């Protein structure tokens, strides 16, 4: 086990090192000099509230680590292949990607890097690669400002960190956000008590905080103090998550130590099966969780979050580090009851490229050297990262992080993402976290085009200053995009923002003038990575006209199973089933489809039609909760031909199990119901409803659209 203590700064080659019996030498770990073994400080003051680590992303990426103070030349770029989460459907696309160039590399092995001082001192040569008997772990003193990263005297002068860390790793399969995570085997207990390891100082609890493609995050407790921490456990047996990659992450954490807006690494350990990264435990949850749960946010709260993230990015960018996976899941809140302050976490995909001040300082270049491997989460990827992923480009710079911040800010202010992917497949599961190559490609095209809108219905109440900042963050060209310094100096962050309600999914529906209705964020679906589910299952080329409505029949609740109940709970009818939806929509578009007309007997209620008011027909409208249910006002349509049939406008069936009542430019304004006719039908419907109620409680949107 390697620890950094508060001893003097002399090099390790001139200092005696105390190690466990199985380790009698030392190793240069990512630029850190090994120190004496032993816990020498108490972490009881660390943590202090904060957000639990959640949904860890550890997608494969080409490690890029530089420990010098100079930029590497642009020709040092690696292949534009990397890991992004999109899904099994993305694997086919990945297989068709072609590399534009590939460089020969020399692999750096631990046993090959030996200093002359090591050989002359008579100390055994460290050979940890491929040996199960070696047990290596380490710890850092986080409060010693004098302890800096240094290199061993004997670390080969001709070798660079690029040689050490530049390891080609396989491309990870693209998964939709929130989908396809793999479970990591539970960490085994300590087998040899004579070795000091993670379980000598900490014990795991049953509280699981999150998981990712290659690891999991769990709560652990210090055996000495009882203080809780979050431990990231990474399975070292995986093919793509190498030891060198972990060391790079540890090194970047060390560089970012003590920053108030970056989660702190406290310990790290390694045994024969896993890596253990012990970090401060945050208790406020990820920012995404707050967006989903809170009903009211203000521009002031959004401003504070933006400022905190910008401060973290400025700190990292000034040190040549790009985060490359900025998203709401990786922004952790310190307080469960407040959205700010926040801390940036998960540096697994970060890439370190310190600026070359002597040649061209950061402030004097429009675009910094490329970061090569495209990584991150799809909805938050900058256009240049998408270009690198699809092979249209071989480089992008640290401004990819400020684009991602722009997407987050847009979401905080509007409640949905500026860019979404969609397709025409009825059975597409993209919105539920399942892979869909068509949706993925559509999303990429939209991001590459860089086109987005500020719909008046949601953005009319948002200040022009906030919109201006979003516009400058979502610039297609990185040269024109704001950097962290420009963000922090923007007038919206320099003043106290107006107390405007943050339009999140919970409160969008309460606005009477809202045309782009709720994007219900439900944990019932795996939407922790997908902020905007706006795939339309019904589109119309021309705007429909409203028919005259008769008397108000009250408020009805639409259930996900298609049943329709009146306010009193009495069964009123059912919607057509899912299979008829596609045909109905397509034929209705072309004018070839006429919905079946049900004539009611004098003893039964007349057919009813669901209508939305005229002012809601200009933009997409969506009503949906966790089980696709919603609450609306019912009206009995006026009959234009003297009978009780529904005549105008033409109506189509709605895909109840997935999407209800949307359109683009032209809104579906009517849905025909099948009225009840017989006692047998009523009994059958009631039986079905009772069965559904016993199986799953019905969730409802608690407001209605008033015509």
From Swiss-Prot:
Gene Ontology annotations of biological process type: behavioral response to nicotine; determination of adult lifespan; intracellular signal transduction; regulation of protein deneddylation
This protein's GO CC annotations: cytoplasm; nucleus
Keyword rRNA processing recorded: no
Residues the record marks as active site: 325
Function: Serine/threonine-protein kinase which is required in the germline to positively regulate lifespan. May play a role in body wall muscle contraction. May be involved in embryonic cytokinesis.
InterPro entries: CDPK_Ser/Thr_kinases, Kinase-like_dom_sf, Prot_kinase_dom, Protein_kinase_ATP_BS, Ser/Thr_kinase_AS
Species the sequence originates in: Caenorhabditis elegans
Organ and tissue specificity: Expressed in pharynx, intestine, vulva and body wall muscles.
Swiss-Prot/TrEMBL cofactor(s): Mg(2+)
Name under which the protein is recorded: MAP kinase-interacting serine/threonine-protein kinase mnk-1
């Amino acid at each position: 086990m390697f620890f950094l203590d508060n001893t003097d700064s002399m090099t390790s080659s001139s200092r005696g090192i105390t190690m466990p019996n199985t380790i009698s030498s030392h190793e240069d770990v990512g630029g850190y000099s090994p120190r004496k073994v032993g816990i020498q400080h108490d972490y009881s003051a660390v943590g202090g509230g904060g957000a639990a680590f959640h949904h860890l992303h550890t997608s494969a990426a080409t490690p890029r680590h530089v420990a010098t103070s100079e930029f590497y030349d642009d020709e040092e770029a690696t292949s534009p292949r990397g890991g992004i989460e999109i899904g099994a459907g993305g694997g086919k696309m990945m297989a068709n990607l072609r590399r534009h160039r590939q460089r020969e590399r020399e692999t750096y092995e631990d046993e090959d890097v030996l200093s002359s001082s090591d050989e002359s001192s008579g100390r055994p040569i460290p050979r940890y690669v491929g040996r199960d008997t070696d047990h290596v772990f380490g710890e850092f003193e986080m409060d010693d400002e004098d302890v800096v990263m240094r290199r061993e005297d004997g670390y080969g002068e001709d070798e660079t960190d690029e040689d050490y860390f530049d390891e080609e790793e396989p491309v990870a399969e693209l998964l939709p956000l929130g989908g396809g995570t793999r479970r990591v085997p539970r960490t085994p207990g300590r087998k040899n008590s004579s070795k000091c390891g993670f379980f000598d100082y900490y014990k795991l609890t049953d509280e699981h905080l999150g998981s990712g493609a290659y690891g999991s995050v769990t709560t652990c407790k210090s055996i000495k103090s009882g203080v809780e921490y979050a431990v990231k456990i990474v399975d070292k047996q995986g093919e793509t998550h190498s030891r060198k990659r972990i060391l790079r992450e540890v090194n970047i954490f060390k560089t970012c130590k003590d920053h108030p807006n970056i989660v702190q690494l406290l310990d790290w350990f390694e045994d024969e099966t896993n890596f253990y990264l012990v970090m401060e435990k945050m208790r406020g949850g990820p920012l995404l969780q707050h967006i989903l749960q809170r009903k009211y946010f203000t521009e002031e709260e959004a401003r504070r979050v933006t400022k905190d993230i910008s401060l973290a990015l400025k700190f990292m960018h000034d040190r040549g580090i790009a985060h490359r996976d900025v998203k709401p899941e990786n922004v952790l809140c310190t307080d469960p009851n407040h959205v700010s302050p926040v801390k940036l976490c998960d540096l697994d995909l970060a890439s370190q490229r310190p600026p070359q001040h002597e040649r061209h300082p950061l402030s004097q270049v429009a675009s910094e050297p490329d970061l090569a491997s495209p990584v991150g989460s799809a909805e938050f990827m900058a256009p240049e990262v998408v270009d690198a992923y699809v092979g249209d480009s071989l480089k992008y710079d640290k401004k990819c992080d400020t684009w991602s911040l722009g997407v987050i800010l847009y979401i905080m202010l509007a409640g949905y993402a500026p860019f979404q992917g969609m397709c025409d497949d009825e059975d597409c599961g993209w919105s539920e976290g399942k892979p869909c190559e068509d949706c993925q490609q559509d999303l990429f095209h939209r991001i590459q085009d860089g086109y987005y809108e500020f719909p008046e219905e949601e953005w009319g109440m948002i200040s022009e200053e906030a919109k201006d900042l979003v516009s400058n963050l979502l610039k297609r060209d990185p040269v024109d995009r704001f950097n962290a310094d420009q963000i922090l100096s923007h007038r919206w962050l320099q003043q106290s923002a107006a107390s405007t309600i943050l339009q999140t999914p919970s409160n969008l529906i309460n606005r009477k003038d809202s045309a782009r209705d709720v994007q219900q964020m439900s944990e019932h679906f795996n939407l922790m990575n997908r902020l905007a589910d706006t795939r339309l299952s019904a589109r119309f080329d021309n705007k429909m006209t409203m028919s005259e409505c008769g008397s108000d029949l009250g408020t009805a609740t639409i259930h996900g199973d298609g049943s329709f109940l009146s306010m009193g709970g009495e069964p009123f009818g059912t919607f057509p089933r899912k299979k008829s939806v596609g045909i109905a929509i397509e034929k209705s578009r072309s004018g070839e489809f006429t919905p079946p007309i049900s004539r009611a007997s004098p003893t039964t209620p007349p057919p009813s039609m669901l209508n939305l008011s005229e002012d809601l027909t200009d933009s997409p409208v969506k009503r949906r909760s966790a089980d696709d249910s919603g609450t609306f006002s019912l009206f009995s349509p006026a009959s234009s031909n003297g009978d009780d049939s529904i005549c105008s406008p033409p109506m189509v069936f709605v895909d109840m199990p997935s999407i209800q009542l949307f359109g683009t430019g032209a809104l579906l304004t009517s849905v025909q119901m099948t009225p009840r006719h017989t006692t047998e039908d009523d009994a059958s419907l009631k039986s079905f409803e009772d069965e559904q109620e016993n199986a799953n409680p019905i969730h409802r949107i608690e407001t209605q659209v008033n015509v």
